[in-house]
């Protein structure tokens, strides 16, 4: 209710999901110079919407069988928990935008989404690590 009271139910004022995330102050910063990438601060946006979404992200991460938990674990390992919560809040806002604009039903991708994504790539990476450790492993499909 708090989210809809802030953004409204009419999404025609936001042409794309990037516009609403920028308005909310949840768009990721991207500063690149000479092939060096530095993350920037998120811009000032609607404080009520931002804090509400980050609070919702805290709650969504508690369910260990959800896509948001998998996203949080993947990002927090490298970037830290606070940035991971902001990233989850950003994903939630994009989902809310498409639910309100297009009328689609939310479908949770599940916690194993990232494991199924690029399965071949992960297999090759693990085989390469084992080979570097001196192990030769035959590959047999299960």
Sequence positions of predicted segments:
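Low-complexity, acidic/Ser/Thr- and charged residue-rich accessory regions of DNA metabolism proteins
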Residues: 34-39, 71-75, 79-90, 95-142
């Amino acid at each position: 209710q708090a989210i809809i009271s802030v953004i409204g139910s009419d999404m025609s004022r936001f042409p794309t999901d990037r516009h609403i995330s920028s308005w909310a102050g949840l768009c990721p910063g991207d500063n690149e110079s000479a092939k060096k990438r530095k993350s920037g601060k998120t811009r000032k946006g609607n404080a009520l919407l931002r804090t509400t979404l980050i609070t919702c992200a805290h709650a969504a991460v508690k369910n260990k069988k959800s896509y948001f938990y998998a996203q949080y674990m993947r990002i927090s390992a490298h970037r830290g928990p606070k940035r991971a919560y902001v990233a989850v809040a950003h994903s939630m806002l994009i989902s809310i935008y498409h639910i309100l604009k297009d009328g689609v039903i939310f479908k949770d991708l599940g916690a194993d989404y990232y494991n199924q994504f690029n399965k071949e790539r992960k297999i090759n990476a693990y085989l390469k690590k084992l080979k570097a450790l001196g192990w030769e492993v035959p590959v047999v499909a299960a």
